[in-house]
Design a protein with these regions (language model features):
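Extended, folded cores of ATP/NTP-driven motor/assembly subunits in large transport
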Residues: 1, 6-269
Length: 269
């Protein structure tokens, strides 16, 4: 699935892989002052540096068309006073404004990290430790985050596999024992069609996948924002595997050596 961590070095995956997914909120980077943007960028760099070479992770940005009954997150808690009716009315107004400004597109952000382990019992303590660290690091950035449980992850994948559909997600853990089916049976669409070379079909919806290779020496910090602001249902994923510093330096030196050889060969022509 798109929310499971991507494959990395084979030696990391000789054992089973266990994952966790967190949903996190946005940070107002684009409207911040230049000074605040610098601080946010530094904090984000520190957040990324937490993940070492043994902890691959994936960032997922999911844009989906809102359905009737879907709820935008507006956190205005009720209080023990006589103004709750005003709060309710104001919350409804904000949700309507958000829906209009987003053209009906709901935008969600996730981070999924994975660890190799012999079994669930061995994986759980480290997963929980990493989860606590990641949530704490988010909090230092002023970003709220929360883990998804198994059912919430299934619901998310169900939405990914039923784009444009109004089919509700129906699943309870007890259903597995009652039906004998696995979790995948509850989220799979009625059909897949991969006969086209540049597109595919999931149920009644057509889609396409693209791979972006960044070769530019400079990259605008607005690139991802501009992609995610497209008025379309789309998913952008970043598969990130930190490289050990010694190995990275060796790789860079090797690339420089290759470039020097190419220069010499060109000069001989």
């Amino acid at each position: 699935s798109t929310l499971l961590a991507s494959s990395a070095a084979s030696d990391v995956y000789k054992r089973q892989v266990y994952t966790k997914t967190l949903e996190y909120e946005d940070i107002n980077y684009s409207v911040a002052s230049a000074e605040d943007q610098t601080a946010i960028f530094g904090g984000w760099s520190s957040w990324l540096n937490y993940f070492d070479s043994s902890l691959p992770f994936q960032l997922s940005f999911v844009n989906r068309r809102s359905r009737s009954g879907s709820r935008y997150k507006v956190n205005i808690s009720e209080a023990d006073d006589r103004f709750n009716s005003v709060r309710t009315e104001y919350t409804g107004m904000l949700k309507n404004q958000i829906a209009k400004s987003n053209n009906g597109i709901e935008r969600a952000k996730y981070v999924t990290f994975c660890i190799p382990a012999e079994n669930v019992a061995a994986a759980r303590p480290r997963l929980e430790r990493v989860e606590a660290d990641v949530i704490g690091n988010f909090k230092r950035l002023g970003v709220q985050s929360q883990p998804l449980d198994g059912r919430e992850r299934l619901a998310l994948l169900h939405g990914q596999l039923h784009p444009g559909s109004r089919e509700p997600f129906r699943f309870k853990w007890a259903d597995i024992a009652h039906t004998g089916m696995g979790t995948k049976d509850f989220i799979v669409p009625d059909s897949f069609d991969f006969r086209q070379s540049r597109s595919f079909r999931v149920g009644q919806t057509w889609g396409a996948a693209s791979y972006l290779q960044i070769m530019a020496s400079e990259l605008s910090d607005k690139l991802l924002l501009e992609i995610l602001e497209l008025d379309a249902e789309l998913t952008v994923t970043m598969h990130i595997q930190t490289v050990d510093q010694v190995k990275a330096i060796k790789t860079v030196k090797g690339k420089i050596s290759d470039i020097d050889k190419m220069k010499v060969e060109e000069q001989r022509k």
